[in-house]
Amino acid sequence: MKLLLAIAGLFLVQTLAEDVRAHEESSFLAAVAPEEQRACIKEGEKCAGDCQCCGKWSYCSCPLFGALGCSCIIGDAMVCVRKKKECRTSDVMNTPPGGCFSSSKRRHGR
């Protein structure tokens, strides 16, 4: 019976320690400077979501369900459309200027 109480006590202490650790982690993340939260990630670097990747056509790719890690890669115009709906930061969507389907090449004569 004492062994059961000791195990229950250790479980309670472990649970409380995890709660405190999670609270400290969330308060640390809230204290991160706003510039660091808004900074975008260049292609080839590790990411956690599409809105972190710089450029309107770049997105966060996680091959093999993230087993190899996730990184920003170049996408297409549909990535731009999706990011316009999901992402709130302007520095992610500002390069290159123009719409999602814009092209610098103009067709002449047709």
UniProtKB/Swiss-Prot annotation:
UniProt note: domains: The presence of a 'disulfide through disulfide knot' structurally defines this protein as a knottin.
GO cellular component: extracellular region
Lineage: Eukaryota, Metazoa, Ecdysozoa, Arthropoda, Chelicerata
Tissues expressed in: Expressed by the venom gland.
Protein known as: U9-agatoxin-Ao1a
A single GO molecular function term of this UniProt record: toxin activity
Keywords: Disulfide bond, Knottin, Secreted, Signal, Toxin
Segments crossing the lipid bilayer: none
Signal in keyword set: yes
Source domain of life: Eukaryota
Signal peptide (UniProt feature, chain positions): 1-17
Coarse class of the protein's main subcellular location: secreted
Subcellular location: Secreted
Species for this entry: Agelena orientalis
